[in-house]
Amino acid sequence: MSRVAKAPVVIPAGVEVKLNGQDISIKGKNGELSRKIHNAVEVKQADNALTFAPREGFVDGWAQAGTTRALLNAMVIGVTEGFTKKLQLVGVGYRAAVKGNMVNLSLGFSHPVEHALPAGITAECPSQTEIVLKGADKQVIGQVAAELRAYRRPEPYKGKGVRYADEVVRTKEAKKK
């Protein structure tokens, strides 16, 4: 039995939940998110909470119920508070700028790197070496942050590259003669 699935997801005021078979959509002040629920999971809406239980005949019912509960909880948090992810650019000449829905990066290549942001994601640059991503969908925020980081991952000798703000880069010692 899943401990995660036993806890209900509380729906705060101002959040509207529509449950239609195995499809669910959650609407709040930061937008609307929808998701298809796994067939092994039964979701019930009672008052201002969502409860989860496995369906009969599925071996992985409790596991899927716990996963579904975590995903729907992230959706509720996303439409109420939203998610943010911070990136830092470390290195001489590494710069970032945002124009519309494009993030322009100078990462030491012979050309500037331009990355288009998906719908629902906004970016801002408090300084030339910081990028702050904001949005309602936790998965998309993480995916965009990983794509930006993949252009120039932190290298292990000097730590230069694009890193998450809370990331600790372990540096190696240089080769000795």
Swiss-Prot record:
GO terms for biological process: cytoplasmic translation. Signal peptide: none annotated. One of its GO terms (molecular function) is rRNA binding. One of its GO terms (cellular component) is cytosolic large ribosomal subunit. Pfam families: Ribosomal_L6. PROSITE patterns: RIBOSOMAL_L6_1. PANTHER family: 60S/50S RIBOSOMAL PROTEIN L6/L9, LARGE RIBOSOMAL SUBUNIT PROTEIN UL6M. This protein binds to the 23S rRNA, and is important in its secondary structure. It is located near the subunit interface in the base of the L7/L12 stalk, and near the tRNA binding site of the peptidyltransferase center. HAMAP family: Ribosomal_uL6_B. Belongs to the universal ribosomal protein uL6 family. This is Large ribosomal subunit protein uL6. It comes from Pectobacterium atrosepticum (strain SCRI 1043 / ATCC BAA-672).
